[in-house]
């Protein structure tokens, strides 16, 4: 029996509420709650994470859209009216992450908060949000890999509804969203299980662990996708950026250990909680 999964969850008058949006919102909520909970242990107030979120989410979406438009400029230069039509699709996670990082650095400077500690606290939640939001691609039947066979998908022992959803226009496709979501879930479990061990992570290293893990996963998965953004029609943008981030994070980790010598992550912010900025 065919299981047709509708990307639209429900309608509000003339507006469609899609599962992709619901899953993204759920991911943001989970990330926020995780950051607030961990932040209390590291002596960072919940209000700081909520205030950061109010800036980071909208600017992150703008960054994700700008990133996509820049690398699809051949199309958007001919259809400038579509540049702001984000409701038609077209955002890129790396653009959102870059924009969010810029917001965080400015926010930490204004609030006098340690940026690497904030990154450490926020990174696992971001990873959890990515695990959840990738299922929006599943509901939309997008961001998939190349054509494959029913027998291959069955050999992965996938639930029938996943296999059925990968049947698009008469062919089966690789569920790359599932590969990325699963691998990120493994990375998230590892980070969460290790981050509270004494004398393991110094400040900034949980964030760098996330960068190393995600960039490796994205490089692998991006090579399988059929909707990649390209540079000069030859180089996959996300693979190139993943390589830069992977090696850049390793170099920064070594540099900070040998030269900067940061505090241990478990030492927290050093601020008296709850603190007063007046």
UniProtKB/Swiss-Prot annotation:
Pathway: Protein modification; lipoprotein biosynthesis (diacylglyceryl transfer). One of its GO terms (cellular component) is plasma membrane. The keyword Ribonucleoprotein does not apply. Coiled coil: none annotated. It comes from the Bacteria. It is found in: Cell membrane. Its main location: membrane. Catalyzes the transfer of the diacylglyceryl group from phosphatidylglycerol to the sulfhydryl group of the N-terminal cysteine of a prolipoprotein, the first step in the formation of mature lipoproteins. HAMAP family: Lgt. This is Phosphatidylglycerol--prolipoprotein diacylglyceryl transferase. It comes from Lactobacillus johnsonii (strain CNCM I-12250 / La1 / NCC 533).
């Amino acid at each position: 029996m065919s299981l047709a999964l509708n990307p639209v969850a429900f309608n509000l008058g003339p507006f469609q509420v899609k599962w992709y949006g619901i899953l993204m919102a759920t991911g943001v909520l989970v990330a926020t709650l995780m950051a607030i909970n961990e932040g209390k242990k590291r002596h960072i107030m919940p209000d700081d994470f909520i205030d950061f979120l109010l800036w980071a989410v909208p600017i992150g979406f703008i960054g994700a859209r700008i990133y996509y438009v820049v690398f699809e400029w051949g199309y958007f230069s001919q259809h400038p009216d579509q540049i702001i039509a984000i409701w038609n699709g077209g955002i890129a996670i790396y653009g959102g992450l870059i924009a969010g990082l810029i917001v965080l650095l400015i926010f930490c400077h204004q609030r006098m908060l340690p940026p690497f500690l904030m990154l450490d606290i926020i990174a696992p939640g971001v990873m959890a949000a990515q695990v959840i939001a990738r299922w929006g691609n599943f509901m939309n039947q997008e961001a998939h890999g190349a054509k494959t066979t029913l027998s291959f998908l069955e050999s992965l022992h996938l639930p029938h509804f996943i296999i059925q959803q990968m049947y698009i226009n008469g062919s089966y496709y690789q569920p790359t969203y599932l590969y990325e979501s699963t691998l990120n879930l493994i990375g998230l479990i590892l980070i969460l299980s290790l981050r509270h061990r004494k004398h393991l992570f110094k400040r900034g290293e949980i964030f760098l662990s996330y960068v190393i893990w995600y960039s490796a996963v994205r490089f692998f998965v991006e090579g399988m996708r059929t909707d990649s953004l390209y540079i000069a029609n030859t180089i996959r943008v996300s693979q190139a950026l993943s390589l830069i981030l992977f090696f850049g994070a390793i170099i920064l980790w070594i540099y900070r250990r040998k030269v900067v010598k940061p505090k241990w992550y478990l030492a927290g912010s050093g601020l008296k909680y709850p603190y007063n900025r007046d």
